[in-house]
Amino acid sequence: MENEHQYSGARCSGQAAYVAKRQECAK
Protein backbone atom coordinates (compact mmCIF):
# COMPACT_ATOMS: atom_id res chain seq x y z
CA MET A 1 0.00 0.00 0.00
CA GLU A 2 2.85 2.38 0.83
CA ASN A 3 4.18 1.84 -2.67
CA GLU A 4 0.82 2.62 -4.21
CA HIS A 5 0.65 5.91 -2.32
CA GLN A 6 4.14 6.87 -3.43
CA TYR A 7 3.28 6.11 -7.05
CA SER A 8 0.10 8.17 -6.81
CA GLY A 9 2.03 11.11 -5.35
CA ALA A 10 4.66 10.95 -8.08
CA ARG A 11 1.98 10.74 -10.74
CA CYS A 12 0.27 13.84 -9.38
CA SER A 13 3.69 15.53 -9.26
CA GLY A 14 2.50 17.62 -6.32
CA GLN A 15 3.78 17.47 -2.75
CA ALA A 16 0.64 19.17 -1.43
CA ALA A 17 -1.56 16.54 -3.09
CA TYR A 18 0.69 13.76 -1.78
CA VAL A 19 0.48 15.10 1.79
CA ALA A 20 -3.29 15.57 1.55
CA LYS A 21 -3.72 12.04 0.24
CA ARG A 22 -1.51 10.66 3.00
CA GLN A 23 -3.46 12.54 5.68
CA GLU A 24 -6.74 11.26 4.27
CA CYS A 25 -5.45 7.70 4.39
CA ALA A 26 -4.21 8.15 7.96
CA LYS A 27 -7.58 9.53 9.08
Curated annotation (Swiss-Prot):
Effect of a null allele: Decreased expression of downstream gene iraD.
A GO biological process held by the record: regulation of translation
Induction comment: Expressed at high levels during late logarithmic and stationary growth (at protein level). Translation is repressed by CsrA.
UniProt keywords, alphabetically: Leader peptide, Translation regulation
Function per UniProt: A short protein whose stop codon overlaps with the start codon of downstream iraD; its mRNA secondary structure is predicted to fold and sequester the Shine-Dalgarno sequence of iraD. When this protein is expressed the downstream iraD is also expressed due to ribosomal coupling.
Record protein name field: iraD leader peptide
